[in-house]
Swiss-Prot record:
Segments in the Cytoplasmic topological domain: 1-92, 149-158, 216-223, 269-270, 371-398, 447-462
Enzyme class: transferase
Catalytic activity: [GlcNAc-(1->4)-Mur2Ac(oyl-L-Ala-gamma-D-Glu-L-Lys-D-Ala-D-Ala)](n)-di-trans,octa-cis-undecaprenyl diphosphate + beta-D-GlcNAc-(1->4)-Mur2Ac(oyl-L-Ala-gamma-D-Glu-L-Lys-D-Ala-D-Ala)-di-trans,octa-cis-undecaprenyl diphosphate = [GlcNAc-(1->4)-Mur2Ac(oyl-L-Ala-gamma-D-Glu-L-Lys-D-Ala-D-Ala)](n+1)-di-trans,octa-cis-undecaprenyl diphosphate + di-trans,octa-cis-undecaprenyl diphosphate + H(+)
Periplasmic side: 114-127, 180-192, 245-247, 292-349, 420-425
Annotated Basic residues bias: 13-27
Gene Ontology terms: biological process: cell wall organization; FtsZ-dependent cytokinesis; peptidoglycan biosynthetic process; regulation of cell shape
Protein name: Probable peptidoglycan glycosyltransferase FtsW
Source domain of life: Bacteria
HAMAP family noted in UniProt: PGT_FtsW_proteobact (MF_00913)
Topology with respect to the bilayer: Multi-pass membrane protein
Known function: Peptidoglycan polymerase that is essential for cell division.
Transmembrane segments: 93-113, 128-148, 159-179, 193-215, 224-244, 248-268, 271-291, 350-370, 399-419, 426-446
Record EC number: 2.4.99.28
Organism: Burkholderia thailandensis (strain ATCC 700388 / DSM 13276 / CCUG 48851 / CIP 106301 / E264)
């Protein structure tokens, strides 16, 4: 005969202990209680009778409710996307730009420290050019902060107006007694404490206007009369005004920006090829018809010839000597000999030669890599904007990259003897108020494009 199963004794509360492993109604297993807790519960069972059972039940209910609420909250929080750690804009681009600006401050001071020894600057202090350069940097920083706060849509809206303002500036600089001439070129408008160079404004204006034009005329990009010809006329007009200064270097940069943006905007391939051929033919004709430009080409081809070494090729020969003295690691910061009134414009057009002499091949290579990074990031930001269907922003960003790439390439080519001498500064590095100002504004516009890209990718609005 089978023995009866053992039935647990009832406690004073009238309740049985749940069986081991049985799930509690609030989702908690009874065996999760430690042995000491169970022992205390057995001894205090009688005390729980009557009024003691209700508080304990309420406490358990509250604990279970809190657990359920916590679980629900964790489920909801798990379904919610985590906060984005995306930066507001590309800080690597910002720091590379700051590095070039900082290098420019050091090298401008080094390259200009001996200039007061010449009769032309005898009244200047040793740090006069450094002080002016630092003031230009402060003004450029303030302008860049303001430009960064301007939405890209505003630049798009007022692009034609900015182009017209820059065009008027190119006309004003040619008016006698208004435009300031230096070394036979009339490129500056005196503004009291500083000089403004309208060609620098035109570089930014044509970058923005070319992007705006390409977007407005997108359906006519395959047409010669409606798509290609109006922009070609605008660039030709700008080129004519720049050549009257004369400023061939600025014209080459402006033409490169306009042609590059049109090409990236989808202009007809045959029309673009015709534009390139026309530009090359125009430059060739200008060189051939101008005796002094022709002499400069001959001097570039053979700078060590006795006829040119002390004349048209004087800057080039001393620039090459500076690079030769620098070798791999340079003669040391401040140790340049060519800047001691041997190399003209050492703090502006030929500052790379001073960098090569004092910091050597390694220093020049670092400068090249920094500019490469700016150009690369410009195109990446532009491509990202195009992927977000922001055609104007994308073309404008790439236009900034073309601007910096073309001007840096021409300046470096001139310093290294790869290109004929042109009056172009090295962006962000060379001494100059207008150049530094417009370079910083253009980088601020580029960072604004990147900022808006990131806002849109986070699901925001601009």
């Amino acid at each position: 005969m089978r023995e009866p199963r053992h039935v647990p004794q009832l406690r004073a509360s009238g309740r049985r202990f749940p069986q081991r492993g049985r799930r509690h109604r609030f989702g908690k297993r009874n065996d999760a209680m430690s042995w000491s807790d169970r022992l205390v519960s057995r001894f205090n069972g009688a005390r729980d009778a009557g009024g003691g059972a209700a508080p304990r039940t309420a406490a358990r209910a509250a604990s279970g409710a809190r657990a359920a609420a916590g679980g629900l909250a964790s489920v909801v929080n798990g379904a919610r996307p985590t906060r984005s750690r995306m930066l507001d804009f590309d800080y690597s681009l910002l720091w590379v730009s700051i590095a070039l600006l900082g290098l420019g401050v050091v090298m401008v001071y080094s390259a200009s420290i001996a200039m007061p020894d010449s009769p032309k600057y005898a009244s200047y202090h040793d740090y006069a050019f450094l002080l002016r350069h630092c003031v230009s940097l402060v003004v450029a920083f303030v302008a860049a902060v303001i430009a960064f706060r301007v939405p890209v849509s505003t630049w798009d809206k007022y692009a034609p107006h900015l182009f017209l303002i820059a065009l008027v500036g190119l006309v004003i600089v040619l008016i006698p007694h208004i435009g300031k001439g230096v070394n036979g070129a009339r490129r500056w408008i005196p503004l009291g404490i500083t000089n403004m160079q309208p060609s620098e404004i035109m570089k930014l204006a044509v970058t923005i206007y070319a992007a705006n034009y390409t977007v407005r005329k997108q359906e006519y990009m395959q047409s010669f009369a409606k798509g290609f010809l109006p922009m070609a006329f605008a660039v030709g007009l700008v080129g004519a005004l720049l050549l009257l200064e004369p400023d061939m270097g600025a014209f080459m940069v402006v033409a490169a920006i306009a042609m590059g943006v049109l090409f990236l905007g989808g202009v007809n391939g045959k029309l673009f090829g015709g534009l390139v051929a026309t530009a090359v033919g125009t430059f060739t004709m200008l060189v051939w018809l101008s005796p002094w430009r022709r002499e400069r080409i001959f001097a570039y081809l053979d700078p060590w010839d006795e006829r040119y070494a002390q004349g048209k090729a004087y800057q080039l020969t001393h620039s090459l000597i500076a690079f030769g003295r620098g070798e791999w690691f340079g003669v040391g910061l401040g140790g340049s000999v060519e800047k001691l009134n041997y190399l003209p414009e050492a703090h502006t057009d030929f500052i790379l030669a001073v960098i090569g002499e004092e910091l050597g091949f390694v220093g020049v290579l670092v400068v090249i890599l920094l500019f490469y990074w700016i150009v690369r990031r410009s195109f990446e930001i532009g491509r990202q904007a195009l992927a977000l269907d922001r055609t104007f922003a994308g073309l404008m960003a790439k236009g900034v990259g073309i601007w910096f790439g073309a001007q840096a390439f021409i300046n470096m080519g001139v310093n290294l003897g790869l290109l004929p001498t042109k009056g172009l500064t090295l962006p962000l590095v060379s001494y100059g108020g207008s150049g530094i100002l417009l370079n910083c504004i253009s980088l601020a516009v580029l960072l604004r494009v990147d900022y808006e890209n990131r806002v849109l990718m986070r699901g925001g609005k601009v």
